[in-house]
Regions:
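Extracytoplasmic soluble-region selector
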Residues: 2-290
Length: 290
C-alpha cells in the first residue's frame, strides 16, 4: 500500500492538532488563595492532557512550580502558591503552553485577605457512638467570594460550653474532636501531615460521646487574622433509634401491627428496647370537590 501523499499527511496532522487543542482544558479558570505571612497555601492546577511549560506573570504574587516534571521540562500538573507580601487583593496570570501543539491555557491566580470564616457540614446532627461527622472551614473575602483552598492553614478548634442548651450542664462533654489518624477515613494529604505535628487544619472529625447539644468554635491561628471572628456551629447528639419495620404500612380498620424499637451503637443493634402495638380503630373519610 502506497504511503499517504504529503498533503494528506499534513491534513491528518492538522486534524490531530485541532483535536488536541479543542480537548485540552484546565481544571479551574480562576483560583482564589488567602494571603498569609507564615504558611504557604498551595493549589494544584492540572490540564486534561498534554505536557505543558508553566509560567506566572507575577511570581511575587503567585508562583508556579512543576509537579511530576519529566526530561522535557514539562508537566501536566503544576502547583500555584500564594506569595504576596501585601495584605491587599492582587492577581497573577498563570500560563500553560503545550510543548507539542503550542496551545496556551490560562488561569487567574488571585491572592486576597480572609474577611470571614464559617463551618460547613452535611448535617448538624450526629448519632451517639456512630460514624463521625466531618466539619470543614469555608473562608470568604470582603465581597463574599469563597477561597479555593485553605490547605496548610492552621486553625484552633475547641469545644465550648453551649449556654443555650437548657438542662445539659456538661454539654461541652457531649462531643470530642477525632483525628483522622484515629479513624477509618482518608483525609487530604496535607491534613495527615498536619496531624503528625499536632496541628489542626481546615477539616476535622467530631464524634458524639453522650446525648445533648454541643458547640464547636474554630479560629485562624495566624496572627494577621486575629481580627477575624471565630466560626461557631451547634451540633445535636442523638441516640440512634430504629423503628422496625421502618417502611410504610397500610392497615385496615380493626387491625394492628407490632413495632419494635431498636438501639444502634457503632453500627450494631445493641438490643431491643420495647415492643408496642399500633391499632387502627377509626376510619377517616375524605371528600373531594370537583
Amino acid at each position: 500500500m502506497a504511503p499517504p501523499a504529503p498533503r494528506t499527511l499534513s491534513f491528518l496532522l492538522l486534524l490531530l492538532s485541532l483535536h488536541l487543542t479543542a480537548s485540552s482544558k484546565l481544571n479551574i479558570p480562576k483560583v482564589l488563595l488567602p494571603f498569609t505571612r507564615g504558611t504557604r497555601v498551595n493549589f494544584t492546577l492540572e490540564a486534561s492532557e498534554g505536557c505543558y511549560r508553566w509560567s506566572s506573570t507575577r511570581p511575587e504574587v503567585a508562583s508556579i512550580e512543576l509537579a511530576d516534571q519529566d526530561e522535557r521540562q514539562c508537566s501536566q500538573r503544576a502547583v500555584v502558591q500564594a506569595r504576596s507580601s501585601q495584605p491587599t487583593r492582587l492577581t497573577s496570570i498563570i500560563f500553560a503552553e503545550d510543548i507539542m501543539t503550542g496551545q496556551v491555557l490560562r488561569c487567574d491566580a488571585i491572592v486576597d485577605i480572609i474577611h470571614d470564616i464559617q463551618i460547613v457540614s452535611t448535617t448538624r446532627e450526629l448519632y451517639l457512638e456512630d460514624s463521625p461527622l466531618e466539619l470543614k472551614i469555608q473562608a470568604l473575602d470582603s465581597e463574599g467570594n469563597t477561597f479555593s483552598t485553605l490547605a496548610g492553614l492552621v486553625f484552633d478548634w475547641t469545644i465550648v460550653k453551649d449556654t443555650e442548651a437548657d438542662g445539659f450542664s456538661d454539654s461541652h462533654n457531649a462531643l470530642r474532636i477525632l483525628k483522622f489518624l484515629e479513624s477509618t477515613y482518608i483525609p487530604p494529604s496535607y491534613i495527615s501531615e498536619m496531624e503528625k505535628v499536632a496541628k489542626q487544619g481546615d477539616t476535622i472529625l467530631v464524634s458524639g460521646m453522650k446525648t445533648g447539644s454541643s458547640k464547636l468554635k474554630a479560629r485562624i491561628q495566624e496572627s494577621v487574622y486575629k481580627h477575624v471572628h471565630p466560626a461557631e456551629v451547634r451540633l445535636l447528639i442523638l441516640e440512634n433509634i430504629l423503628l422496625n419495620p421502618a417502611y410504610d404500612i397500610y392497615l385496615l380498620v380493626g387491625t394492628s401491627v407490632q413495632y419494635r424499637v431498636q438501639k444502634i451503637r457503632q453500627g450494631k443493634i445493641t438490643g431491643l428496647s420495647f415492643f408496642f402495638f399500633l391499632n387502627v380503630l377509626y376510619k377517616f373519610l375524605t371528600t373531594k370537590k370537583f
